[in-house]
Amino acid sequence: MKDRDAIALISAAVTKPGGVWADLGAGSGVFTRALAMLLGPDGTVYAVDSDPGSLRELDRSTGTEATPGAMVRTIIGDFTGPLDLPRLDGALIANALHYVSYSDQPAVVRRIASLLTEAAPLVVVEYDRTHVNQWVPYPITPAALTALTRDAGLGTPAILATQPARYSGTIYSAIVRR
């Protein structure tokens, strides 16, 4: 996915510059870079991923003139467990929640929500599909996301944007608050 596609999916969620956000399951940073650009130089993005190689790649692609924006701090860690992060003005989990088993998803979403300030958004980017494969072992349709966020004690998500997925189907972004 290109940075501009990631920006198109999440831009409606970033309503003001600055703030402290986390990109959970950041990988090599496509959505981290998009978020950093949207937040601008007064923002901070904590990019959390369990793969040190992906985070090294992310470090190489941020903080340069070619990718201006928020300060990006990489953290090697598993977003499904406890995280040592400050209170967040927003959290993004893009193309990562579908790796968490259905039985663990509510607890993970509750844990992430506990890091958010009162009105802060949780932004989710996922594939709108039901077909399971090795890349999307636990698909989360918009309807499934609604059930998940309600189970986790959050509100009803609103779809922000959709676009064709690279290989098949659709990718969507959604925002949810308490």
Task: Give the predicted meaning of each segment.
Residues T80-A91:
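A short acidic, Gly/Pro-enriched loop at the edge of an enzyme's catalytic core
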